[in-house]
């Protein structure tokens, strides 16, 4: 029997094995940024094993005449059996959002424990996955999640793992149905750092007046500060002191110094976001800066330019070097 998922416009199906393996590969590549590649790969393999059940396959092949099937519980339960609550949460919520943990006595509710307690029998039993994919019993976990003195690090890790899985699942499904989309793009942060240095070099060399000299002092300190160790930093400068470019210079310098790949610039008020985003786009290039907030109009009318289309896609998962929000 061929196990399938995702009906394409041409009437063919994506194989379930292909989807499982490609979601695992994508999730692993995303999670590699925080040392969780192996763990995310296994989570990707777990996420859709419920579709290997008889009812799951009937639903895939004839959705109009078949009731919805809970395909997330099987992977959730297997993750729990593997003593992997992180993956259990991620798999349980990969369509509806992260569930509450609940209580061990829960039954029939939307909590994680209710899924773990659910009894899969007959047409919902998905053991056929074992004929197509290999899910490793043991994987490497980042050591830092177990060294935290409280649970905050582990809850953040769960959300990060969940995010990697959901993005990978969405992207592979999109590719299977619509073909490869114009995602990604933009220059490296190293290139953007060179741009901001080139833009500000004339100011540093010859300040026009005393105010410009003070702005230069702020800028120079931010650039030097970017070389410091990771941590939380504050920049306290009066209005007119040049915080916009100085703070971005710090961010780019710091990110390049520590091998990071994205700047997320978070500020209040949409008017200020729009103003700062324009400054960054003028210096760094519009193709490298994504402005995303409640007032951004994202057209989907078939008339948009390739660049506008790429930015609309980037708003879905912030796939841009610099995000201003």
Q: Language model features by range: what are they?
A:
Residues 74, 78, 90, 250, ...:
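Alpha-helical scaffold elements adjacent to nucleotide-binding pockets in ATP/GTP-utilizing enzyme cores
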Residues 228-235, 261-262, 319-321:
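Pre-Walker A (Motif I) flank of P-loop NTPase domains
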Residues 19, 200-236:
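Conserved pre-motif I regulatory segment
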Residues 253-262, 284-288:
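Post-Walker A helix-loop "phosphate-sensing" segment adjacent to the P-loop in P-loop NTPases
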